[in-house]
Amino acid sequence: MMIKLIVNADDFGLTEGTNYGIIDGHINGLVNSTTMMMNMPGTEHAVRLAKEYNLLGVGVHLVLTAGEPLLKDVPSLVGENGSFHKQSVVREGNINPEEVEREWTAQIEKFLSYGLTPTHLDSHHHVHGLPILHDVLERLAAKYNVPIRRCEEDRAVHPFSDVFYSDFYADGVTEDYFVKLKERVQGEQTVEIMVHPAYIDPELVKRSSYVMDRVKELRILTESELPEGIELVKF
């Protein structure tokens, strides 16, 4: 009875320090998958690394709550400064799903334009779990033939795992996290764990409030070994 594990590093492309942390977590640790942000300062750098380290599965980290959109004509998605709304505003639901679909399509198409093949889709701040965007995700999953990160909601769209854990984060980043994993998972399930390893650079400090713990995550991801009965799998 093997538990199949995907350790996905979010925020590939956020900054160069983030990118190097993810690659280090892949080469020397448990990270076997990542998702790329297409509208960030480190995106081009992430593309180069993705091609260099092609054993790392790379999907698209759909963005709606950080940086600026790729498209100009998406008024419901941006504030007066032209940047995406904060997460709290998006969660109020005053966004136009049609604009989200166009913007997310542009993000996926930009990923494809680099000659990369996406393994799956997920989203920054997990906004793809919003009920208002359910139909958008169904169409994108079908159009690009990719699975999507499981949401806590019952209406998960084409999920690729039986279980999704987002608690390896902040206070949940513990030395024994992976050792205790077996106690939490039943039988032959596929499990995804979301992680955020990084090396700190000035751009990360500017763009994220989650900084120091990323370095701790990276250390634990590179020092931990999986218990018997758990194997890393790719999509």
Curated annotation (Swiss-Prot):
Keywords: Carbohydrate metabolism, Hydrolase, Magnesium, Metal-binding. It is an enzyme of class 3 (hydrolase). Its EC number is 3.5.1.-. Pfam families: YdjC. GO terms for biological process: polysaccharide catabolic process. Mg(2+) binds at residues 61, 124. Its cofactor is Mg(2+). The keyword Transferase does not apply. The keyword Metal-binding applies. InterPro entries: COD_ChbG_bac, Glyco_hydro/deAcase_b/a-brl, YdjC-like. One of its GO terms (molecular function) is hydrolase activity, acting on carbon-nitrogen (but not peptide) bonds, in linear amides. Probably catalyzes the deacetylation of acetylated carbohydrates an important step in the degradation of oligosaccharides. This is Carbohydrate deacetylase. It comes from Bacillus cereus (strain ATCC 14579 / DSM 31 / CCUG 7414 / JCM 2152 / NBRC 15305 / NCIMB 9373 / NCTC 2599 / NRRL B-3711). The lineage of its organism: Bacteria, Bacillati, Bacillota, Bacilli, Bacillales.
